[in-house]
Amino acid sequence: MNNILVITVNYKNTIITENFIHSLENLDASDKVELIVVDSESTPKTKENLQSLLNSSALKTRLIDSVSNTFYWGGVALALKTLDLNYANGPSWIIACNNDILFSQREFFSKLKELDSTKYHVIAPSILSTKTGENLNPYMAKPINIIGKLYYSIFYLNPSTARLIYNTRKMSQKLFYSVFKKSIPKPGKIYAPQGSFIIFSNNYFLRGGYIDNNFKIFGEEISTAEIALNNNLEIHFLPELAVSHVEHSSMGTNYWSYWFYFSKEAYKYLKKTYL
């Protein structure tokens, strides 16, 4: 087994995964990487396209296909179950990430390999939005407090209320940032990592950590945070490790409804299980 395992999930559009793979291939120490692509709700066409991509890559690769929609975190869980890793003798680092991530830092894996996997159980790197340029990490510095829970109880009343709150918050953030310079986040321990790119050490799993996929989407950040907390594991924000995230440029009505109901479902589960 190579030193670093990368798991990503493809859904329908294989061009996004192709861009992801090409960016990964250009990195130093990519010979120490094994790439697993989960093809969620696989079709003969997506499977053929992805297999062709992986066959032509210099990376060590494997394709895992699923006829059902695994969603993101379910796809990661499926990959780990299929691989049935021996974490004591397997990869030191397991990266779970969206396929709309781009590696722009050539020495990313070289830097990661230098870190102590017994010290850094979960790593949140800099995730730079290609849309805004903002760093999406740290996702949450501290757990949700009483005010936060009240906010979410109002937010999830209905889609219209949620969208009004969302737009108001976005406008206030833009106003705030135009008046006050945003401080550069400092490295250190945090509560929750942003979910589009999370680095787990093998020690996360050896010491009781796991992937909770009892939700469809939007629950990976808090579930990871709470599992780490309950097992005395640490999550570190390390900004010197950086990737780019090609975020959605717009949020139309259909996508908003989709986002609202799935995120509400995830929050309901997280609140019942962890919060």
Where do the model's predicted regions map?
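Short beta-strand-to-loop acidic/aromatic patch adjacent to the donor-nucleotide binding site
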Residues: 90-102
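Short, well-formed alpha-helical segments that are part of the catalytic scaffolds
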Residues: 13-27
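A recurrent flexible, glycine/aromatic-enriched loop bordering the glycosyltransferase active site
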Residues: 161-170, 178-200
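Conserved donor NDP-sugar-binding/catalytic core segment of glycosyltransferases
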Residues: 102-139
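Glycine-rich, basic loop-to-helix element that forms the pyrophosphate-binding segment
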Residues: 66-86
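Active-site-adjacent helix/loop segment of glycosyltransferases
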Residues: 165-170, 222-275
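A short, conserved alpha-helix in the catalytic core of glycosyltransferases
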Residues: 185, 191-210, 214-241
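A conserved acidic beta->alpha catalytic loop
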Residues: 23, 39-50, 68, 98
